[in-house]
Amino acid sequence: MITPFPALKKLTLTAALLISSLSANANETPTNATITPTWQQTLTQAKGETVYFNAWGGSQEINDYLLWANTQLQQRYGVTLKQVKVTDIAETTQRLLAEKTAGKNSGGSVDMVWINGENFRSMKRNGLLYGPFTHQLPNWKYVDKSLPIDKDFSEPTQGLEAPWGVGQLVFIYDPETLSNPPKSFKALLALAQQHPGKISYPKPPEFHGTSFLKAALLELTMDKQALYQPLQLPQDQALFNRVTAPLWHYLDQLHKVAWHQGKQFPAGTAETIQLLDDQQLLLAITFNPNAAAAAIANGNLTEKAKTYAFSAGALTNIHFLAIPWNANAKAGALVAINFLLSPEAQARKADTSLWGDPTILSPQAFTKLPAPYNQQNFKPYPSIAEPNPTWLAAIEQQWQQRYGN
């Protein structure tokens, strides 16, 4: 599942002028003198191709961003980017598995996917990905190699997917109603006990809800390292029970004093932000460090709202773009991904009035863009690595058995 984002502000006239200037001045594509023969061949092959891009479709702002990207790709390269909106990329994984089983090794229905975590691991392990390809991308040179881009939920990426953005599990609060926000899950429970009905989290398996469970477990368990090793059930059932026991004990206590006594949960991050703004909750939860700024810009939160992470750091992952092994438009997908890694496209994506997804490029990549896009100074919170994805389904299933009904 890919990180959803809250509703963001529409493009203002000022922002439109900045973006127009940005588009005119961006230099994301090498000049003809620096284009390699191999990449020129890719550009030639891509012209006229339609790239069917399977991506989460739950945010109008992200959908609008992809429409903009399609326009740019058509005008510059003759490539059409067609978003195929899905609720969960696991659906795409199953479709690709079916094509693999049927022996459909070319002319596939999917040309590009937005993935991370368990879906990447599944696609990689089942031979569903094309590549390695990242070394072919001219804009790969701009990527900030200090970010954890070489692993995806502990699974080595090996050039089979290109990083697109950064997600961190953070909280939003209003200083006027909560002057001293909790800095740990233990402190969060204490706050909930002091203010019954004011704390909640999205219902798993919604991405943010599951992320809340993983982050809590990483703090509470006595065997953190086990979470970074593959879990094999049923033989590891005793290990699973022992490692996760502190989480269920914690949630038993939290739900007693949670919003609706833990019998009802927000649908996702957008609802937690709305409940925070309505003063029904003291904290909202998001996987986008820019979400508060975006919600403020959109008028969905007080201007005093702040974002923060717990003292131990923030659960962190990168979300990626990949190409299936049987894609019908591999060249077009390579051109589309290269464009989405350009300073221009990354700066627009990071704009909190448009999407607000933090960039994965180094700050130096933006120096030739007009202000304010020439200063992309995203500074991530101290990061906590995602557990091995094999734990995910077991945690969600156990949560469902205990609390889902």
Sequence positions of predicted segments:
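Extracytoplasmic ligand-binding site segments that recognize negatively charged/polar headgroups
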Residues: 56-68, 84-91, 106-270
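Extracytoplasmic/periplasmic substrate-binding proteins
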Residues: 260-322, 365-366
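Short, polar/charged alpha-helical segment
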Residues: 38-47, 59-80, 171
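Boundary at the C-terminal end of the N-terminal hydrophobic targeting segment
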Residues: 24-28
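Bacterial N-terminal signal peptides that target proteins for export
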Residues: 2-12
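Conserved C-terminal helix/tail region of periplasmic/extracytoplasmic solute-binding proteins
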Residues: 29-39, 274, 375-405
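Mature extracytoplasmic/periplasmic domains
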Residues: 314-383
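Bacterial N-terminal signal peptides
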Residues: 12-21
